[in-house]
Amino acid sequence: MSTNAELFDRACRSIPGGVNSPVRAFRSVGGTPRFIQRAQGPYVWDAEGKQYIDYVGSWGPAILGHAHPEVVRAVQEAAVHGLSFGAPTEAEVELAEMLIARLPSLEQVRLVSSGTEATMTAIRLARGATGRHKIIKFEGCYHGHSDSLLVKAGSGLLTFGNPSSAGVPPEFVAHTLTLEFNNLAAVDAAFSQHGAEIACVIVEPVAGNMNLIKPAEGFLAGLRELCTRHGAVLIFDEVMTGFRVGPQGVQGLTGVRPDLTTLAKVIGGGMPVGAFGGRADLMAHIAPLGGVYQAGTLSGNPVAVAAGLATMRLIGEPGFYERLSAQTARLAQGLQERARAAGVPFSADAIGGMFGLYFGDRVPASFAEVSACDTEAFKRFFHAMLERGIHFAPSAFEAGFVSATHDDAVIDATLEAAEQVFATLRA
């Protein structure tokens, strides 16, 4: 049996940094990444056979818990009939119809293979439909790794403290206006100066890539009003929040309807599926109907779509989100209570099946506030919890995820471990 350290050393010889996505490398917390061998329900097991309660959840998709038998069965049955056709299938039509039925803002939807593809194409579509070039995004909001969006982005870029990425020419981001999240006045000012040039505003309606930051009261409604007034397209990036925080995502919780929505993660059930969709008049600009090009060899892959369909059916059962939200809130509140009892500056927040942990006295509301949290305290907390078999995201700037299989016993075990760890942090 290889150890995690042996596997990481081996990986570093053939894979840049030893990982296929930067945050997995443990660079911001130090130490050796855990190489996961298998997963079931709320648990993962590493290469050394150690079991962990998992709050990474594949970074969001594992809303049903790992390896749900009905999802696994759907994948197996689909694979028997072929892994990829490069042609339309009835299953992809069924998934599109299901997404449209669940999200009132979707009139038409196009399937892709990742969240990055979805957001990249949604922005291209907004530009093509409006004939404008500038876009507005927000500090700390991550919309995938396409060039024009790697400006003060969240996720791994926050982990490494980079405001942007090498390899992105200044000309590529010249049309990207980056503003403070939750600062509606700044958006109003940008529209006052550049209104006729702005194609779209793209936003994580609940930011999940600079930890978890909720929208301020009126922020999303204000974006909707400004976009409508100036003829810009409002894009909700619900790659992370879509069907994770509620049955209609953040747009269902707030009643704010975007023009376009991007989705991924949960809709693939752990397989690579993304989507973008919205108003039919906008979607009519996408090839083959219009001049905005988008294509993908594996878009609508039948095996991935089978996983998505099975997942979407299961999360549509009555009471699913009420139970998920209650368990997530119980975890967040329990952690906060135990930290404060130990005298550790700490706050927690939750929405649906997502939560945020902050080593500071209050829940942050912006990129600057989350950046001011105590990352050294988080490192100590992360490793102490990992030693006790609790697997949180290896970054102070990532949201956490609870699944339907995180029952009372799992939450209790997590809180018991946290109580021990907070006592050591105080010492």
From Swiss-Prot:
List localization entries.
Answer: Cytoplasm
Which SUPFAM superfamilies does the record associate with it? PLP-dependent transferases
- E.C. no: 5.4.3.8
Molecular function in Gene Ontology: glutamate-1-semialdehyde 2,1-aminomutase activity; pyridoxal phosphate binding; transaminase activity
The alphabetical list of record keywords is: Cytoplasm, Isomerase, Porphyrin biosynthesis, Pyridoxal phosphate
Q: What is its main location?
A: cytoplasm
Identify which cofactors the protein needs according to its UniProt entry.
Answer: pyridoxal 5'-phosphate
Can you cite a GO biological process for this protein? protoporphyrinogen IX biosynthetic process
As its record notes, the protein acts as a catalyst of: (S)-4-amino-5-oxopentanoate = 5-aminolevulinate
One family name in Pfam for this protein: Aminotran_3
Q: Which residues carry this modification: N6-(pyridoxal phosphate)lysine?
A: K265
Under InterPro entries, the record lists:
4pyrrol_synth_GluAld_NH2Trfase, Aminotrans_3, Aminotrans_3_PPA_site, PyrdxlP-dep_Trfase, PyrdxlP-dep_Trfase_major, PyrdxlP-dep_Trfase_small
Please give the pathway this protein is involved in. Answer: Porphyrin-containing compound metabolism; protoporphyrin-IX biosynthesis; 5-aminolevulinate from L-glutamyl-tRNA(Glu): step 2/2
Q: What class of enzyme is it?
A: isomerase
Tell me a GO cellular component.
cytoplasm
Q: Which domain of life is it from?
A: Bacteria
In the UniProt record, does the keyword Protein transport occur?
Answer: no
| HAMAP family in UniProt | HemL_aminotrans_3
Similarity comment text for this entry: Belongs to the class-III pyridoxal-phosphate-dependent aminotransferase family. HemL subfamily.
Q: How does it assemble?
A: Homodimer.
Could you identify this protein by its name?
Glutamate-1-semialdehyde 2,1-aminomutase
Q: Which organism is it from?
A: Bordetella bronchiseptica (strain ATCC BAA-588 / NCTC 13252 / RB50)
